């Protein structure tokens, strides 16, 4: 008996509480990590300046990164904590430095120091006398231009030539718009899938599938928070990708459930047994398709550039979560929803009537 045969005959619905608890523990761990360290939000969602340094003639990447860090911590008077050596200077907080092939990307957040105190750009309106939004943007653009000029001069002195510096600024209003658009995109995708499954199968199947998708997204967020992976537009693309990919495995399970329920021989079979059989029948397909996809994504995560890795890591989390929910959560959730709504429909209706030869009322139940 091979492993798939053993797994095929397992009692998945009966272990639903255990499998759900495992997912909840991961999600809770992600929430705790988010409360402690926060999400590693990219510049698209926070606003700020991103400086890219392209070093074509540099052979020692580690040395170049150290040189770049020394400039950030020394010449700019700004440390990675955002503290300014000169209290009169307005400096952006340095969030991180990442290596992307030959490009070194410095991401500066929206926190500034003014008169020795940290001031968030969202709260700088009281600090400026007029045109808060315009002035906030102008200050950031001016800093961006200064960074370009100073960093270019510094690196050219160190490496003579072959160094190009460029920067981009994302304002707070733009960051809010990107975040709002991302949330809408995910919500619309989930809503469309709910409608599709409700039409193709049943409303309860659709609800179970949507709960499984929400589980997948929450696991992706939790793991991303635990490992402090950057949350940017690439991450949103990964979420939408997983929503579209993982729903296929879930649909296969519900398609098998529908097929079994149509058979005359299954009319007296319980929902639990039908769900277990449907999971067992589709288990091999779900595992193998997920595994083959994972192999390619893992290779991208290992050998890809930083930008590709930022996409690959959430995809890996999502693929595992998707297979987990398709096998262990979606169908059992459907069983419990069916049980819940059947109980709601079959509540006993109490009628008072007198029994023969007695004055005591009798309670009759309508099934």
Regions found by a protein language model. Give the residues of each.
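A structural signal for conserved, well-ordered secondary-structure elements
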Residues: 1-367
């Amino acid at each position: 008996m091979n492993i798939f045969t053993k797994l095929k005959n397992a009692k998945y619905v009966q272990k639903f509480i255990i499998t759900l608890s495992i997912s909840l523990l991961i999600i809770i761990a992600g929430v705790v990590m988010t409360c402690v360290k926060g999400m590693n939000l990219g510049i698209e969602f926070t606003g700020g300046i991103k400086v890219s340094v392209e070093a074509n003639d540099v052979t020692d990447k580690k040395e170049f990164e150290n040189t770049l860090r020394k400039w950030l911590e020394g010449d700019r008077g700004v440390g990675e904590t955002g503290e300014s050596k000169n209290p009169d200077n307005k400096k952006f907080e340095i969030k991180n430095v990442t290596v992307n092939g030959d490009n070194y990307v410095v991401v500066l957040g929206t926190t500034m120091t003014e008169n020795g105190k940290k001031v968030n750009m969202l709260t700088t309106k009281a600090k400026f006398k007029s045109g808060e939004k315009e002035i906030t943007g102008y200050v950031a653009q001016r800093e961006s231009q200064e960074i370009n000029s100073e960093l270019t001069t510094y690196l050219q002195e160190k490496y003579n030539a072959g160094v190009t510096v460029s920067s981009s600024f994302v304002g707070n209003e733009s960051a809010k718009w990107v975040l709002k658009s991302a949330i809408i995109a995910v919500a619309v995708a989930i809503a469309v899938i709910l409608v599709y499954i409700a039409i193709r199968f049943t409303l309860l199947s659709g609800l179970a599938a949507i709960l499984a998708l929400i589980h997948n997204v929450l696991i992706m967020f939790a793991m991303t928070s635990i490992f402090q992976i950057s949350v940017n537009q690439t991450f949103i693309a990964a979420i939408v990708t997983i929503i579209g990919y993982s729903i296929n495995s879930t649909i296969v399970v519900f398609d098998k459930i529908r097929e079994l329920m149509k058979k005359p021989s299954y009319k007296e079979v319980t929902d639990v047994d039908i769900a277990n059989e449907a999971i067992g029948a589709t288990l091999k397909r779900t595992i193998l398709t997920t595994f083959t996809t994972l192999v390619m994504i893992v290779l991208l995560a290992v050998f890809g550039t930083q930008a590709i890795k930022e996409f690959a890591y959430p995809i890996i989390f999502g693929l595992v979560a998707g297979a987990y929910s398709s096998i262990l959560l979606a169908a059992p959730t459907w069983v419990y929803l069916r049980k819940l709504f059947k109980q709601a429909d079959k509540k006993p209706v109490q009628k008072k009537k007198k029994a023969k030869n007695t004055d005591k009322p009798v309670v009759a139940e309508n099934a």
